[in-house]
Amino acid sequence: MSTNSFFAKFLRFIGIVLMALTGGFTFLGGVGTFCAAVFPQKYESMAGLIPYQWLYILFMLGTIAIGVWGIWAAIKLIKGTTDAYWMSLYALIAGVLVGGFHIYMSRMLRGKSMPVDAVVYTTLLTLVIFLLFKIPMIWQGVDFSKAKASDNKKAGGAAAILVGLFTLTIQYTMGSTHTWGGVNYADAFNTSMAVIGIGLLLLGAGIFVSLRNVRETALRLQVQQ
């Protein structure tokens, strides 16, 4: 498979977008564990977590760290660095292991584990796809370090917009699993999430605008020649 073939570009695009979404989702999942980790005594459904509060604080910090790791890996994929793929793979494996243990403990202590499940299943899907990328025939074309920077930047722009939209709507998409006593705690960091979400939307739009300007400039130079 050629590095510049449509299929190779498509797979790289999917890989970068999925990695960025997974990193962002994991980070937000870690932030969303704050209430259960720091104030389990405030919620009747979290009473079983009180003796293990220290563990849930570790889950929260670990998940946030893995989320940042995943986002950093996605940025490296966009830049096409030689260590980008393996960094992504290690971050995904860490996410599955820590998230899987989190699911096990939550189901054992309080009988359910949502929304951790959604984060782990997303991470597992991305991990499977990245493992498939390493099949020799596929990797020959997908290899992120050999791609044109402009192709990867398109995926980066799309990823920034999608993560931005997800950040802006997290209080609605996760409201059902974060509502106790009629209060939606997924909306606890509304201002911060709004600022981050809008910032990501502007970043994504800016990337596409800059790529368009570069393309138009290149076309004008060709015409002049």
Report residues per predicted region.
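Topology signature of small-to-medium multi-pass alpha-helical membrane proteins
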Residues: 1-225
